[in-house]
Amino acid sequence: MAAYTAIDDPEAYFQAEAYTGTGSTRTVTLSADTDMQPDVVWIKKRASNYNHNLFDSVRGVNKGMYVNNDAVEHDSNADGYLSAFSSDGFQVQAGSSTSDYVNVDGETYVAWCWKETADAGFDMVTYTGNETARTISHSLSAVPHFMTVRNRTATNDWLTYHHKNTAAPETDYLYLNLDSATQDQDIQWNDTAPTSSVFSVGTSGYTNGNTDGHIIYLWTGKQGYSKFGGYTGNGNADGAFIFCGFRPAFV
């Protein structure tokens, strides 16, 4: 294993966990063999059309963002929230009016959990926008393959970069929360590719809104653990086969 990848234990950096809500304080313990304190927890109620809720250790507990829409960062007290990150999981709490989003009694949920570390190719950066094209440092020590950024205080969509999106991906972007096709604007990434130490933003309110708080999540591929690529569909019932070099836990 070590000859193929430096990550011998992927469960130390990513785990997916299904759990059932209790309607009150609920400690969710990750069931894999390896203990992991997550830095990002993305929660979805499985049987209903409620929003995807994202929490992270940089913004802090009880600060949710919906991955599937453009709502601003919210205090989740009313609808249930993540109240703590633990050494091997997290804690969810019922809200003051309902617990629908994370912890309804008897309802099933899935949580995708990441550990922030350059070893596994994942970083988070918060910054304040200034509407001036510039570079911002990250800690991956490698070129990001995938980035998604969110203006925390404005009703903007999730601006997303993928290194295989087009021949010149730094000139283009996708929306994580919309089904729109690829778009081209230099005001998003300033038409500048990210490097092993910085990423670029332009003058857009999506990536660099003046005085607005932003958070960006950055990943780079790690052989045997994560991969960010593209494929061409073939229209066949069996579909196209996409080789990752490992069995993925999250697609």
Label each PLM-derived region with a short phrase.
Residues 1-250:
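Surface-exposed molecular-recognition determinants
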